[in-house]
Design a protein with these regions (language model features):
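Glycine-rich phosphate-binding active-site loops on the catalytic face of alpha/beta enzymes
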Residues: 83, 94-112, 168, 198-202, ...
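Charged helix-capping and loop-helix junction motifs
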Residues: 60-67, 142-151, 176-184
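Glycine-rich, proline-tolerant flexible connector loops at the mouths of alpha/beta enzymes
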Residues: 46-64, 104, 165-176
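Catalytic cores of alpha/beta
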Residues: 70-73, 77-99, 181-216
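Conserved anion-binding
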Residues: 12, 19-23, 90, 97-172
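Conserved, mostly hydrophobic/aromatic
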Residues: 8, 39, 47, 79, ...
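Glycine/small-residue-rich loop that forms an oxyanion/phosphate-binding "nest" at active or ligand-binding sites
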Residues: 53, 58-120
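Structural preference for beta-strand elements that scaffold enzyme active sites
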Residues: 2-6, 46, 74-78, 98-101, ...
């Protein structure tokens, strides 16, 4: 299983939110590039970077910082947050981003994500499915939608998008464990490359996700709060 240390960027700082609430924020560093190099040096094989300003404002506020991360590290970097135009995808890919994660725009227009996967390749486009219960949220998790998780994901899978980043918003940043029940339902869908996000509290959570056959898992707060170590991640992640 691929394990992605998370770097969430807000106003140029490395932060973590609780349940996606911008008012409930902990700062873990003021240099995202330095943080990326740290995780790489400790054995990370991938990085998951989020432009939180972009997620809330709808455009790529931290694009330059993300570009510098991609220039600094040698490992693949996936990026999400406020990516809602084809030009934004193109810019990230040209800046060295390995995989672009589309969220709110894909909920509003699944066709947008489907076309992006066709243009840039299925390995380089993912869709972020961020949910309150079984309902998909949008716009920095502030707004609800009429989309239900499983039918929405099935539509994407049937049309050429296979990498899905699933977040249970109620668990994100809470160290309460992932939503294993929903992970099981999603993992059962044919052809899915499922990445678990939100709630990882310890190495055993990662081991369980790996045993379930998931493609990947993202860990943020558990890593920053030393509930899980990079040594454990190196041991669990794909050899």
């Amino acid at each position: 299983m691929k394990i992605f240390p998370a770097i969430d960027i807000e106003d140029g700082h490395c932060v973590r939110l609780k349940q996606g609430k911008i008012g409930d924020l902990t700062v873990y560093g003021d240099d995202p590039v330095k943080m990326a190099l740290k995780w790489e040096a400790l054995g990370a094989k991938y990085l998951h970077v989020v432009d939180l300003d972009g997620a809330f404002k709808g455009n790529g506020v931290n694009t330059e910082v993300i570009h510098r991360i991609c220039q600094a590290v040698k490992i693949p970097v996936e990026v999400g947050g406020g990516i809602r135009t084809e030009q934004a995808i193109k810019q990230h890919i040209e800046n060295g981003v390995w995989r672009v994660i589309i969220g709110s725009k894909a909920v509003a227009s699944p066709y947008f994500a489907i076309q992006a996967a066709k243009k840039y390749g299925v390995d380089h486009i993912a869709v972020s499915v961020d949910a309150h219960g079984d309902t998909v949220a949008t716009n920095g998790w502030v707004d609800g939608s009429r989309q239900k998780v499983l039918p929405f994901v099935k539509t994407l899978l049937e049309n050429g998008v296979n990498t899905i980043v699933y977040t249970d918003i109620s668990r994100d940043g809470m160290l309460t464990g992932p939503n294993f029940e929903m992970m099981g339902k999603l993992q059962a869908l044919p052809g899915i490359h499922l990445i678990a996000s939100g709630g990882v509290s310890c190495a055993d959570d990662l081991r369980k996700l790996s045993d379930m056959g998931l493609y990947g898992a993202i860990t943020g707060k558990a890593l920053y709060e030393e509930k899980v170590s990079m040594e454990e991640i190196v041991e669990i992640q794909e050899k």
